[in-house]
Amino acid sequence: MANDMELGIETRIEGVVEERGVIALDAKIFSEIVRKLPDSDVTIETDASFKTIISCEKAKFNIVGKSGDDFSYIPYIEKNESIVISQFTLKEVIQQTIFSIADNDNNKLMTGELFEINENELKVVSLDGHRISIRNIELKNNYEHKKVVVPGKTLQEISKIIPGGVDDDVLIYLTDNHIVFDFDTTTVVSRLIEGEYFKIDQMLSSDYETKVKVNKKELLDCIDRSTLLVKEGDKKPIIMNVTDGNMELKINSFIGSMNEDIDIEKEGKDILIGFNPKFFID
């Protein structure tokens, strides 16, 4: 169990318990020790002064722990109606949206993601002032309308530890102040970000004048090649000149220039537009 008062994670594993007890260990040191141990059985022993021995095969670590009496346990959350989605879907959704959250606290809401439940649909939204990511998931059941903002840190940690099985589910519980994710033998409890999220629908146009269909890999490879001429921190845009059946991509920097044509299908007007290549790759 770990808890920083904003995010708490509890997991249960099988083992041989010779004597029950509680001890608090430095999370970083403990995780690094376990990560570097051989793939074999691990023994953890402690004494009355909280000195702890962690051994595995021929490796043995001695570290100092603390009493678990003062440990801040994960708050009890009453679990009412659960929202059920597959582990695979949740992990995929996080990966497809987490890149466009803000990485600073200038606007707290931008450091999280909107989870909006409406009947049998879950909408997940993130934005950082430059990009907006939206993913819609169809749910098996109908639910009352709810909107919460989940910290990006919470979703990043879940993405790291969730197995992501297609046939394995995640149960999500919502309260006024917390969100709970239950999967396998792990429970994640997180505080929510307070405040009214941005009105995304008002930011997006409903009458686009140009629609382009393009091979994703071909476009990605082309933009990736263009970044060879852009140094880190340089804000040179990649220019896209869209005409019937063709998209010309070009970039100019003090290093040099590059242009490439890609076959496309286009509906609507021709357009000349520029984008940050890194944002577009993301």
Where in the sequence are the language-model features?
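Structural preference for solvent-exposed beta-strand-turn elements
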Residues: M1-D282
